[in-house]
Amino acid sequence: MHKVAIVGRPNVGKSSLFNRLIGRREAVVADFPGVTRDAKEGLMLYHNHRITLIDTGGLWSGDEWEQAIREKAEWAMEGAQAVIFVLDPREGLSAADYEVADWLRRLGKPVIVTANKIDSQKHEPYLAELWGLGFGDPVAISAEHARGLDDLMDRVMKYLPEDDEDVPDIAPIRISLIGRPNVGKSSLLNAITQSDRAIVADLPGTTRDSLDVEWDYGGQRFVLVDTAGIRKKPDTAIEDFAIQRSQAAIERSDVIWLVVNATDIGDHELKLANLAYDSGKPVIVVVNKWDLVPDAELKSTEKDLNQKLHHISFAPRVYTSAINDYGIHDMLAEAMKLYEKWQSRIGTSELNRWLEVWQMKQRVPNFHGKPLRMYFMTQVETAPPTFAIFCNRADFVTRAYEGFLQNRIREDLELAGVPVRLKWKEKGPYKKGEADED
């Protein structure tokens, strides 16, 4: 697949261009510099050509992240066949722009100088100065207004090799990592991909943006989404936006990794667990930093996990250490297993055999001596598996009984680990407002 990197100093519109080209809002965009710290990937289709775009952090930012961001950008360059060098010519060329240009020359990749924020022809005189960078004719665009993007991509295509033979497209499993800041999400992502795609530090909230990273495991394609940590009280506008992004990442995922610190589970984790459960997506609780738990405290830590995450007790757990690569492959193997179950369908005859045996063996709820009777069961949806149960009185079904029944369905029908939904439909001799008699 073709790869193209987008580079430039902070706040010249790299992420706006990235979002415009891939057709959705992936990177955090704001009016202050240094918003994108990590290199993130997105897929675009241009005239039937599949292109992976890599959006890099702002180079020569002059802050504590400068060296780490440059290293991520260099990683992005390794597989890129062309580079889109984004500048804001209205501000004039800065020393940082010239440093980026010198750095690009040393890398030896084809470079397309891209003058962003050229919203009309009256701004085009600003382009003259860009010739001095030595990369040829600049392309004028406005990412915000989608101006000049075809000209830009036509120039990019000149540097890309001919496509190989078509390869059958395997639908990827999209997995989001959610968790509070500094719980180890980015370290886990780096351990899985065997790279340093996400910046890792000891500061909360290091990853502000969501990173989409494609990866293969066991013949299966994955898209790993590393979200910004959700905080209870955001202290800046960007953290507030990161909360929304984390929630949105859950919705566009197939499987959710809820990453928790083995020794510190609080209200943040409960909130995230509720969000994950409500989404109907399979949840895997990733207990990170397990290697830091003393042997004498393993049982008590496990008990604490059971108590605090009891409402998603059906969710499987994987115990990991990103530093030691412990449990890393189990995360992906479990995700593949749950994804398959999540989309499974069970035949109606099998369901009703199970329902008949269940009612013979188990006590059912009753109201004033009148029992709940379940006549028929069928699966009406997948992802998550959703079952309609036809009964005499839906109002006899308590929340506790429904939860009990969901657990038994998971246990008996090979749906362990996935959320199950039930829809109750009234049918038969008992109707609300009628006599409760046989």
Swiss-Prot record:
GTP 2 binds at residues 179-186, 226-230, 288-291. This is GTPase Der. One of its GO terms (molecular function) is GTP binding. Signal peptide: none annotated. GO terms for biological process: ribosome biogenesis. Keywords: GTP-binding, Nucleotide-binding, Repeat, Ribosome biogenesis. Residues 344-428 form the KH-like domain. GTP 1 binds at residues 8-15, 55-59, 116-119. Residues 2-164, 173-343 form the EngA-type G domain. Gene3D superfamilies: 3.30.300.20, P-loop containing nucleotide triphosphate hydrolases. It holds the Pfam family MMR_HSR1. GTPase that plays an essential role in the late steps of ribosome biogenesis. Associates with the 50S ribosomal subunit. Belongs to the TRAFAC class TrmE-Era-EngA-EngB-Septin-like GTPase superfamily. EngA (Der) GTPase family. The keyword Repeat applies.
